[in-house]
Amino acid sequence: MEGPEITFAEAVIDNGSYGKRTVRFETGRLAQQAAGAAMVYLDEETSMLSATTVGKSPREGFDFFPLTVDVEERMYASGRIPGSFFRREGRPSTDAILTCRLIDRPLRPAFVKGIRNEVQVVVTVTSIAPDEIYDTVAINAASLSTQLSGLPFSGPIGGVRMALMDDGSGARQWVAFPKHSQLKGAVFNMAVAGRVVGDDVAIMMVEAEATPDSWTLVKERGAQAPTEEIVAEGLEAAKPFIRALCEAQADLVKRAGKDPVDVPVFQDYQDDAYAAVEKLATDRLTEIFSIADKQERESASYAYLLEVLEELAGEGKDFAERKGEIAKAYGSLTKQIVRRRILTDQVRIDGRGLTDIRKLTAEVEVLPRVHGSAIFERGETQIMGVTTLNMLKMEQQIDSLSPETAKRYMHHYNFPPYSTGETGRVGSPKRREIGHGALAERALVPVLPAREEFPYAIRQVSEALSSNGSTSMGSVCASTLSLLNAGVPLRAHVAGIAMGLVSAEVDGQTQYAALTDILGAEDAFGDMDFKVAGTAEFVTAIQLDTKLDGIPASVLASALTQAREARLHILSVLNAAIDAPDEMAPTAPRIISVRIPVDKIGAVIGPKGAMINQIQDDTGADITIEDDGTVLIGATDGASAEAARSAVNAIANPQVPEVGERYLGTVVKLTTFGAFVSLTPGKDGLLHVSELRKLNEGKRVDDVEDVLGVGQKVQVEITKIDDRGKLSLSPVGAESDAVAETADAIESSQTEA
């Protein structure tokens, strides 16, 4: 029986000494009822299916493009059964959500403006090699299935992940589609998407970060620091690979693509509506959008919109049946006024120049009891950062297709509706909040202390209390302050800044104006949101979103340089607020570590956990033992942690006891000839009945139970160690002193309990 005809194309990615990667595109075999379907392979073992579908009719009442991108991670792709109770996939993982955003951002601006039919792109990961990263491959899959559908889409779009490999020997190379294991030796890692425009490749999306090992590679091994120039070099290095991917897609679409689909395209307004609004409102809107204060400006704009609607679309007016068009034309005119002023006068909405930064304030220790807190303000954007420290056993466990199974630094970003003066839903985070938290997390991970140096799980929460431009970069700044306030020994301060872009055709040439520290309105009216975070020495994270079909890499390189100047200014403000880690808060747990021989792990744990549980009960500390013999001990106070460390050392790193050493012991067994006293876990001694007279006012003791009971604390001294290592004990001091010291010890132990 003959199967369906399969059409394919391949793009070979040559990484030189790092080998070749092959991306294979197929269509015709799977998901034949979808408008467009593509199977994409990375080498032999990683594959995914992308299917694009379109609604049969426009959605009523929608004034935006209803595009949905979903990524389905199937656990069978890695030969695993889901770990959930029902043993099936549930809500998407964080990796899947971030991949959805990675696909959506370059795809959305490539559709023709004005589509109101629902479009859905579903990417299903069907198989994956353990060491592979699938996200940028999924961009290519989504691009291809959308082109095959015949929708009005200005593809193809190529997506590639690039890693800067540098071992400090002087030879560095950007490697396409790196593996997870290779990223451990990489200085910088970026996902780039773009499309071919003439002889060049225009960049549409960038998501980049320094790696957790970047600091060590740069500072200790002499690797190249990821400066702005190096990042721009990486964008250029990505272009040939993007071109190869786009050419393979275009070749396949040419042979197997569907005829163009006639999808209705709706204009927001007709020319006559715009002309009427322009004639009436230009002068007044120019005045309104020179008001610096956001709330005052928005209130004035809304009030004037009502006037314009009444004047042009009121009862009996020419546009009485076209109020929606007038409102849209009003918004479009506002956008044009703001953009024209920026390009011609080099002046922005609030009166700033193109490179000016709003007023900055930074303050630490703003909340009681929490482990670390700070507030960072940039103009009307206000972010509160709060840091919480805990044992490493509280690190996040990850169940996804990634080989990463846990992470100790968790960054959560909240954007409540009141931050923009609005009402709305609160509760579980939306995709945008997850994405912003992940961006801030990537910006800070490269400067976190090593796990061995600072053995804590760290949860950082960014609360966007007020928003008027780049709360995500404000979160980076507030988090730097908060982490230092919590006593986290960051390797360097990190600051972030959001850059914008306005472009227009002037005398047949496209003119670009890059804006530093954009407002919310400039984000809405501009062509780009370009976020850059980093230390004084190098870039730690980048995110680029654009509404254009692509931006020349040279323009992005210039914006990177402009962003560095702003970042250095912000860093000076952060350093003035806190220049070094504070002492840890009294409410923060104290965590210490001790190394024990691996063959002693069982002894510390004990039968069915009896020994480790006893130590935890006796000291009040929490103990975690790792496979390499590292024991992490956490407690609310230093004394408890030290007591637990002594107990662990007594078992796994025992010191030979010496005559004359004193201990506060616990009676564990009574016999006719005396009492056995536990000095440390696993180390007991005999307090002979003849010695008990010191606890009985010098009188003879006939029954040990008359003086001591199991569980009782007693201060003792080692008086003899025989040839077999058995310990003989005596109560401490003279008769009266021994009684007093034992009583004091009992009282003290009861108070601590």
Swiss-Prot record:
Keyword field: Cytoplasm, Magnesium, Metal-binding, Nucleotidyltransferase, RNA-binding, Transferase
Names of the cofactor(s): Mg(2+)
Location in the cell: Cytoplasm
Keyword Magnesium: yes
Binding sites annotated in the UniProt record for Mg(2+): D523, D529
Domain of life: Bacteria
Domain S1 motif: 660-732
Enzyme class, broadest EC rank: transferase
EC number: 2.7.7.8
The UniProt record lists the keyword Acetylation: no
GO cellular component: cytosol
GO biological process, one term: RNA processing
Domain KH as annotated: residue spans: 589-648
Gene Ontology molecular-function annotations: 3'-5'-RNA exonuclease activity; magnesium ion binding; polyribonucleotide nucleotidyltransferase activity; RNA binding
Region span, Disordered: 733-753
Coiled coil spans: none
Catalytic activity: RNA(n+1) + phosphate = RNA(n) + a ribonucleoside 5'-diphosphate
Pfam families in the cross-refs: KH_1, PNPase, RNase_PH, S1
Function: Involved in mRNA degradation. Catalyzes the phosphorolysis of single-stranded polyribonucleotides processively in the 3'- to 5'-direction.
Family that this chain belongs to: Belongs to the polyribonucleotide nucleotidyltransferase family.
NCBIfam families (alphabetical): polynuc_phos, pppGpp_PNP, PRK11824.1
Protein known as: Polyribonucleotide nucleotidyltransferase
Species the sequence originates in: Micrococcus luteus (strain ATCC 4698 / DSM 20030 / JCM 1464 / CCM 169 / CCUG 5858 / IAM 1056 / NBRC 3333 / NCIMB 9278 / NCTC 2665 / VKM Ac-2230) (Micrococcus lysodeikticus)
